[in-house]
Regions:
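Alpha-helical residues within the helix-turn-helix
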Residues: 46, 57, 63-64
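N-terminal leader segment of winged-helix/HTH proteins
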Residues: 1-20, 65, 81, 88-93
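Short coil turns linking two alpha-helices in DNA-binding domains
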Residues: 51, 56-58
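N-terminal helix-turn-helix DNA-binding core of bacterial DNA-binding proteins
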Residues: 12-51, 73-84
Length: 97
């Protein structure tokens, strides 16, 4: 596996590294890796002992870095990993969690 090395992706790389610079966000990614079945954003936060506003804040940053996809089903929001982003920019990272 190779990591993309074009300069046009530098801004995206910076967003990814900034998003992963917070321990809580890494814990959220780890939770989604270990629980691949679809989990609501509330379930993610509850399992990590986070209140709703903190969960929303951290998920937004992960979403903006294209590390997760957030979708709505009914009244619930769900978080799902964007494995394509991890494979392109951080190959092997998800396996290390």
């Amino acid at each position: 596996m190779t990591i993309k090395l074009t300069s046009k992706d530098d801004e995206k790389r910076a967003k990814i590294f900034k998003a992963l610079s917070e321990v809580k966000r890494i814990e959220m990614i780890r939770y989604l890796v270990r629980h691949p079945e679809h989990k609501t954003c509330g379930e993610v936060g509850e399992s990590l002992g986070m209140d709703k506003s903190n969960v929303s804040y951290h998920l937004k940053i992960l979403y903006e870095a294209e590390l997760i996809h957030i979708y709505r089903r009914g009244q619930n929001k769900y978080g799902q990993l964007r494995e394509d982003t991890f494979n392109a920019f951080l190959p092997g990272f998800l396996d290390s969690l």
